[in-house]
């Protein structure tokens, strides 16, 4: 991991005005030379951060039986088929659920009903559930997703993502940034040439450029 990333994070933390609340540390990525009107060129990646997100990640699991029981120890909420059907009759409640939840996980057998009752709400938000296969451990899946962020550019050249909190060390935050930048370089059409600039900042602090 380049020392320049650590230096940029340290500056962002040092230059942030003192606050009496815990601040998020965010990354802004500016893209270039991409036709983002073409959906295939857009960024849409889930990335597990090695140092964690530094924030609470809200995860809802759709499950039944033993899987639902196990999920109760890990997820923020566990919903069954009856609750799922109720959301189909209450669009406002469905939208609230989607807006308050970072990630959804669902047993594969429930995916069809989720598409039926919640697809029009979750789909446009990019929040359709991660399907659980029979051999998947729901607790492991939920715990992994607690450290996951979603990179999504849509049709805009600039997008943001959470990379930590201001009480994490510069090295921890820099490690998260390094993983994100490497993933982008590996998946973008022209690799690093498609990245115009990268900035890191706390919620209320100034932006500091992360050198290439």
From Swiss-Prot:
Gene3D superfamilies xrefs: 3.30.190.20, 3.40.50.790
Transmembrane segments: none
Keyword check for Transcription: no
Gene Ontology molecular function terms on file: rRNA binding; structural constituent of ribosome; tRNA binding
Disulfide-bond pairs as recorded: none
A Gene Ontology biological process term: regulation of translation
Quaternary assembly: Part of the 50S ribosomal subunit.
Stated name of the protein: Large ribosomal subunit protein uL1
Gene: rpl1
